[in-house]
Regions:
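Sec-type signal peptide cleavage vicinity
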Residues: 2-8, 19-303
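Hydrophobic alpha-helical targeting segments used for export or membrane insertion
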Residues: 10-15
Length: 303
């Protein structure tokens, strides 16, 4: 599972509970069915780093509904309730369990990708970036009740995206790019994600990457390879990227003058020359490529 575009609306249906003997929506005891809609902040990264404008057919999100200060809402537990998508694009609908709201104030959040094995402690969900899966979270909406049953959640990215725009310079070989890896003192491979607010804990470093690319590099246009990473902050922002080209490994040390933040994309222009790799600048943007650019210094390592 894995994401560059504007907000996409995905309406979730199947939340309306109808009494068997009535054509009207149930309002017994002032209970009103929750109506849910979800927006995705920018793009979604799907499996194998394929970009998509929306959730695909059969995808599921996990929804939590709780009391204002309790895990239960009106005596019922709505923890990690799955809602599944049917159809695609603007015709997509979602179906899941009925959730009835009373006058008591409640709160809710959702996350993606859904896991039926989610830990009871949803503030520490294990994530391993070997799979290069995008994780989305909505944060809490704290204004639910039968007077405010229409719940809109905006899904945000918990990870940062690092994109390499690779092109061929004066390199005379075949220039077939088959893999890219990254490693660094603060580059996390695994960690614990709080799926309610997108925060991270217990981050452990390690190499992340993608293989089997089969990309033919050319002078123009540059070919993009994107990797997902746990956000990096503090002084240890430098990392090494290693590009496997024509069966050889070309390393280069990279960095940025600001933190690698969740929901942002950091685009490096990389040129393959006869003596190795060179970097031009890093462009820091939102997931949708609208942002600021800054020039950085990079230590070049030749093979």
């Amino acid at each position: 599972m894995r994401n560059t575009l504007g907000k996409k609306w995905i309406c979730l249906s199947g939340l309306v509970f109808c009494l068997a003997c009535s054509d009207e929506i149930a309002h017994e005891g002032n209970m009103t069915p929750l109506s849910l809609a979800v927006t995705i902040e920018n793009d979604l990264e799907t499996k194998a780093l394929v970009e998509s404008t929306s959730f695909g057919e059969g995808e599921r999100i996990g929804l939590f509904v709780q009391g204002a200060s309790t895990v239960e809402y009106e005596g019922s537990t709505y923890q990690n309730v799955p809602y599944q998508s049917y159809g695609t694009s603007t015709s997509q609908t979602w179906q899941g369990a009925t959730i009835l709201l009373s006058s008591a104030m409640g709160r809710a959040f959702a996350y993606w990708p859904y896991s039926d094995g989610l830990p009871a402690d949803y503030t520490k969900v294990p994530v391993d970036l070997t799979t290069q899966t995008d994780w989305l979270y909505s944060g809490w909406n704290v204004s639910l009740s039968n007077k405010q049953p229409n719940l809109t959640l905006t899904m945000n990215h918990a990870l940062t995206a690092i994109e390499f725009d690779v092109k061929r310079g004066d390199y005379t070989g075949t220039a077939q790019l088959t893999g890219v890896t990254m490693s660094g003192a603060a580059l996390g491979k695994t960690g614990k994600l709080n799926v309610s607010d997108g925060s991270w804990s217990e981050v452990a470093t390690g190499m992340i990457g993608v293989s089997g690319l089969g990309i033919q590099l050319q002078t123009s246009p540059a070919m993009a390879v994107k990797l997902l990473a746990i956000p990096i902050s503090g002084a240890e922002r430098a990392f090494e990227a290693r590009f496997t080209i024509d069966g050889k490994v070309f390393p280069i040390s990279l960095g940025c003058t600001e933190d690698y933040a969740a929901g942002k994309k950091y685009m490096y222009t990389i040129t393959l020359n006869g003596q190795g790799l060179s970097v031009g600048e890093v462009t820091v943007t939102g997931w949708t490529n609208s942002g600021i650019s800054e020039t950085i210094d990079a230590e070049i390592e030749n093979i």
